[in-house]
Design a protein with these regions (language model features):
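Surface-exposed, polar/charged interaction patches used for macromolecular assembly or partner binding
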Residues: 19-290
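Short linear sequence motifs
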Residues: 6-7, 29
Length: 290
């Protein structure tokens, strides 16, 4: 069952990667830090953002369902609100899993506690201003834009430096710092690897800052996943041997499987770019601040 679910999720994951940011080479991108697309197309979790400015339509609206790089869209702000030619805006939309099928026991509860999830649609630049509306061209695209998307003043996002990848410690001791979980990720996927952008339930209110690193780990013998698991498989497996005594997840070493860097932060959640993974990472895996 788990393999089937993982396969389906992996297909969705690669589809999302294919349709993500059209412009990967941008000013400021470098091999020693996340590139422009990784930072600006990562999505975020925060309190509800102002939503009074919207994409209301665009050119060829009788033909176009969505808008993408180079298209012209119309926003409901014009000269009367101080909009000027050259103004740049970010375009986002609320993001919610339409299925709401939990991958692990506490997933839906944690999602609600973290805040409002937003997907990055891209950026637009104003090219023409009229009294009550403006025309803007899609200058950078993370995917597609659609009528009703939220338009916000553009704020540059920092690209924090990577640490030395060779410093990863597969047997790292417990840091003693805050522990959380990978709750979900972009496009509501549940299976991740290197360069995936995931959401964890610690944010600025818990002293998380952009550039911090999270270590990813899991325990043996946990039964929190929705997918069926065999009870006590960590120390006994019928027909293939058993330990001499019972060992729960508390009795066995944790398994460190990766790490990632914080590229966006909200009050109670952070967006983390996975920089190293020794095997598949799942929603429900644990993280700790390094």
């Amino acid at each position: 069952m788990r393999a089937t679910l993982a396969g389906l999720t992996l297909s969705l994951f690669f589809a999302a990667v294919t349709t993500s940011a059209q412009e990967s080479a941008q000013p400021g991108s470098a091999t020693n830090s996340p590139d422009y697309s990784a930072v600006n197309c990562s999505g975020f979790v925060s309190d509800k953002v102002p939503d009074d400015i919207r994409v209301i339509s665009g050119e060829q609206s009788n033909l176009k369902i969505t808008f993408s790089h180079g298209d012209y869209v119309y926003i409901n702000r014009g000269r009367d609100k101080g909009v000027q030619v050259g103004d740049r805006f970010s375009v986002v939309r609320p993001d919610k899993d339409p299925l709401e099928v939990p991958w692990f026991k506490w997933q839906n509860k944690l999602i609600k506690a973290m805040g409002q999830f937003y997907a990055d649609a891209g950026q637009v630049r104003v090219v023409n201003v009229q009294p009550n509306v403006s025309i803007a061209q899609v200058a950078f695209s993370c995917g597609y834009m659609q009528r009703g998307d939220i338009v916000r003043p553009y704020v540059e996002r920092p690209s924090p430096p990577f640490k030395d990848a060779s410093a990863f410690d597969h047997f790292a001791p417990v840091s003693g710092k805050r522990v959380a979980m990978i709750v979900t990720a972009m496009d509501n996927t549940q299976l991740y690897g290197k360069n995936s952008r995931v959401y964890v339930n610690l944010g600025s209110n818990q002293s998380v800052r952009i550039g911090d690193y999270f270590r990813i780990f899991r325990y043996q013998g946990t039964l929190a996943e929705t997918a069926p698991q065999t009870k006590n498989y960590q120390y006994e497996l019928y027909g293939f041997g058993s330990a001499h005594a019972k060992y729960t997840w508390k009795d066995l070493p944790r398994e460190v499987i990766g790490e990632g860097i914080v590229i966006n932060e909200g009050p109670n959640a952070s967006t983390v770019l996975i920089t190293h993974s020794s095997l598949e990472v799942y929603a429900g895996d644990y993280v700790e601040l390094e």
